[in-house]
Amino acid sequence: MKKIIYLILSNLFIFIIYPIIRFTNKKFYEKKILPSVINSTCNSRPIQYQRKKVVPKAFGIVLEIGIGSGHNLKYYEPSKVTKIYGVDPSNELNKLAKDKASKYSLDVDFIVSSAEEIPLDDNSIDTAVTTFTLCSIPDSQKALNEIYRVLKPSGKLIFSEHGLSPDKFVANIQNGIEFFYPKISGGCHANKDIPNLITNAKFNIDNLETMYLPSRQKFLGYIFCGTANK
């Protein structure tokens, strides 16, 4: 019963309330409502569970794309990680992440930059981590090409992302909401073909798990979780 009520209310907000507020008062929505919506979603139990599955696999010199306010920091294993470069275009979120980094004995260098132009040398990173980030990067393909460039020849990409469902009905919804959903979600696109983007960047996916997140709308909760080699 709780799940049904949640889905009804969340759909009400996604399809009616948020769009009305966003298109009538953009500044208020993006400053007062959107940040708390994103933070709440990123902190939800199903999302945190996915982070916990993949982040501990990181090793050596790590690049985290879209580090945001540092939701992943508590899942890194300090004994396996020598340094983390956290890339995010938001100064405000980087400041929040800095406060968290000191709690977990991690050496983190926060870089305010877009993922499409990573200011790091070629072949300098052991592990790249992306979690629920590619959906909101304007040019995800360019970002993945950049990740490929900075990874060492033995480097690994670790990812957990949501994207295009293989189910036609769900995919039709994902494609159908493109005209408004990115505008109310901070640029998130629900219909990105994550495996295709990764392989187009010349990565070899060696492990891939797919699923629908429990207690979430299927059109926002189809998950691609795995690893890829350079």
Q: Where do the model's predicted regions map?
A:
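Conserved alpha-helix/loop element of class I SAM-dependent methyltransferases that forms part
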Residues: 41-61, 71-75
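Class I SAM-dependent methyltransferase SAM/SAH-binding core
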Residues: 63-117
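A short acidic, Gly/Pro-enriched loop at the edge of an enzyme's catalytic core
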Residues: 116-128
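A short SAM/SAH-binding and catalytic strip from SAM-dependent methyltransferases
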Residues: 126-139
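A short glycine-rich, Lys/Arg-flanked "PGG" loop and its adjoining helix->strand segment in the class I
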Residues: 141-153
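Conserved beta-strand signature within the Rossmann-like core of class I S-adenosyl-L-methionine
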Residues: 154-162
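Short alpha-helix
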Residues: 186-202
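Core SAM-dependent methyltransferase catalytic element
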Residues: 203, 208-230
